[in-house]
From Swiss-Prot:
GO terms for cellular component: extracellular region. Disulfide bonds join 49-63, 56-68, 62-76. The presence of a 'disulfide through disulfide knot' structurally defines this protein as a knottin. The lineage of its organism: Eukaryota, Metazoa, Ecdysozoa, Arthropoda, Chelicerata. The keyword Glycosyltransferase does not apply. GO terms for molecular function: ion channel inhibitor activity; toxin activity. Keywords: Amidation, Disulfide bond, Ion channel impairing toxin, Knottin, Secreted, Signal, Toxin. Coiled coil: none annotated. Belongs to the neurotoxin 10 (Hwtx-1) family. 05 (F4a) subfamily. Residues 22-47 form a propeptide. SUPFAM superfamilies: omega toxin-like. This is U21-theraphotoxin-Cg1a 3. Probable ion channel inhibitor. Expressed by the venom gland.
């Protein structure tokens, strides 16, 4: 019973958002500002180094305090150092 009420409320919320977007105009519905801001979050970035568990070929591929573990497949692992 609780699940069906939650699903109904979710559907009504989505319908409300769609109808309010239609009232504002199709240009705002196609590219809302929040969608553009979310787009920036998920864009891939070129990084200078590989993070923990990232693929590598040599120690210099990995970020600071990480070293290339040459088990197959090679990956960046903590080199047991701390500090700046």
């Amino acid at each position: 019973m609780k699940v069906s009420v939650l699903i109904t409320l979710a559907v009504l919320g989505v319908m409300f958002l769609l109808t309010s977007a239609e009232e504002r105009g199709s240009d705002q519905m196609d590219s809302p500002a929040w969608l553009k801001s979310m787009e920036r979050i998920f864009q891939s970035e070129e990084r200078e180094c590989r993070w923990l568990f990232g693929g590598c070929e040599k120690d210099s591929d990995c970020c600071e305090h990480l070293g290339c573990r040459r088990a197959k497949p090679s990956w960046c692992g903590w080199d047991f150092t701390v500090g700046k």
